[in-house]
């Protein structure tokens, strides 16, 4: 029974995309990604009574150049939706919204699995910035320092046409150094790119 269901799903999936799809062509490309990110913010980061959610709706736009079927380089801008802290410093009514954004520079090695499916990894650096500190009773909360951090991730792409791939990806910005550095982020996304050739 399970085998029949699996076969039907694979059959439907295989015909959901154009039959003549083939690998992306080398050249410049633009990429848009949407998804959710774990900002690893906690109410305790601001001694707050609560936060709305540490999971943030997130978007990323990027431009890159694919040298061949195995290597690309990418630069991107990521914007995380705000995390709202309520009762900062344990004081009711002392609220603040924290916004985070990042600029990244990534090498992107790729492994073709078939003519139109690729596994890829990303490795590089990201500049992470946060705005939204608050001073309550003389104490500064969420006064994060902007910082350069390592960034890495993995993904799977499918070429709908040679010019238009879709992808699923996970990207992490790894906070280093401790202190008042912004916590790490984990971004889970679906994306669509366009290759100019």
Which residue stretches match the model-derived regions?
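Generic marker of residues within folded, mature protein domains
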Residues: 13, 22, 53, 65, ...
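Cleavable N-terminal export/targeting peptides
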Residues: 1-27, 197
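A generic hydrophobic-segment detector
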Residues: 129-176
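Short, basic, glycine/proline-bearing loop/turn elements
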Residues: 45-47
